[in-house]
From Swiss-Prot:
<dbReference type="GO" id="GO:0015935">
    <property type="term" value="C:small ribosomal subunit"/>
</dbReference>
<dbReference type="InterPro" id="IPR001892">
    <property type="entry name" value="Ribosomal_uS13"/>
</dbReference>
<dbReference type="GO" id="GO:0003735">
    <property type="term" value="F:structural constituent of ribosome"/>
</dbReference>
<feature type="region of interest" description="Disordered">
    <location>
        <begin position="92"/>
        <end position="121"/>
    </location>
</feature>
<dbReference type="InterPro" id="IPR010979">
    <property type="entry name" value="Ribosomal_uS13-like_H2TH"/>
</dbReference>
<dbReference type="GO" id="GO:0006412">
    <property type="term" value="P:translation"/>
</dbReference>
<keyword id="KW-0699">rRNA-binding</keyword>
<comment type="function">
    <text>Located at the top of the head of the 30S subunit, it contacts several helices of the 16S rRNA. In the 70S ribosome it contacts the 23S rRNA (bridge B1a) and protein L5 of the 50S subunit (bridge B1b), connecting the 2 subunits; these bridges are implicated in subunit movement. Contacts the tRNAs in the A and P-sites.</text>
</comment>
<dbReference type="InterPro" id="IPR018269">
    <property type="entry name" value="Ribosomal_uS13_CS"/>
</dbReference>
<dbReference type="InterPro" id="IPR027437">
    <property type="entry name" value="Rbsml_uS13_C"/>
</dbReference>
<dbReference type="Pfam" id="PF00416">
    <property type="entry name" value="Ribosomal_S13"/>
</dbReference>
<keyword id="KW-0687">Ribonucleoprotein</keyword>
<protein>
    <recommendedName>
        <fullName>Small ribosomal subunit protein uS13</fullName>
    </recommendedName>
</protein>
<dbReference type="GO" id="GO:0000049">
    <property type="term" value="F:tRNA binding"/>
</dbReference>
<comment type="similarity">
    <text>Belongs to the universal ribosomal protein uS13 family.</text>
</comment>
<comment type="subunit">
    <text>Part of the 30S ribosomal subunit. Forms a loose heterodimer with protein S19. Forms two bridges to the 50S subunit in the 70S ribosome.</text>
</comment>
<keyword id="KW-0820">tRNA-binding</keyword>
Length: 121
């Protein structure tokens, strides 16, 4: 297994697919990285030479990935919540942030249904 940006990339995968295992690198960025380093897209990770891996590590190192990116996203959400703006309030309440309807749907964000109002006996 090759180790790039602190992530073990499976040997049996193609280089492009393997790079997407790194948080912050999707298919478009993985294609761009392979293109700039000159590594074949359809080459398996186990077939990469040490020189190829070093090129990939250097290119991936230019981007914000993994822990730094996760921290940045978390801090961005925390900043919104501290500001008390609409988006921050929605994050705090655990509701959809981007204007989706909540009368029906939004179950992923709201969690499982609470039991309904019970009648007095």
């Amino acid at each position: 297994m090759a180790r790039i940006a602190g992530v073990n990339i499976p040997n049996h995968q193609h280089t492009v697919i393997g790079l997407t295992a790194i948080f912050g690198i999707g298919t478009t960025r993985a294609n761009k990285i392979c293109q700039t380093t000159g590594v074949a897209i359809d080459k398996k990770v186990k077939d990469l030479t040490d020189a190829d891996l070093e090129k990939l590590r250097d290119e991936v190192g230019k981007f914000i990935t993994e822990g730094d990116l996760r921290r940045e996203v978390t801090m961005s959400i925390k900043r919104l919540m501290d500001l008390g703006c609409y988006r921050g309030v929605r994050h705090r309440k655990g509701l959809p942030v981007r204007g989706q309807r909540t009368k029906t749907n939004a179950r992923t964000r709201k969690g499982p249904r609470k039991s309904g109002v019970q009648l007095k006996k």
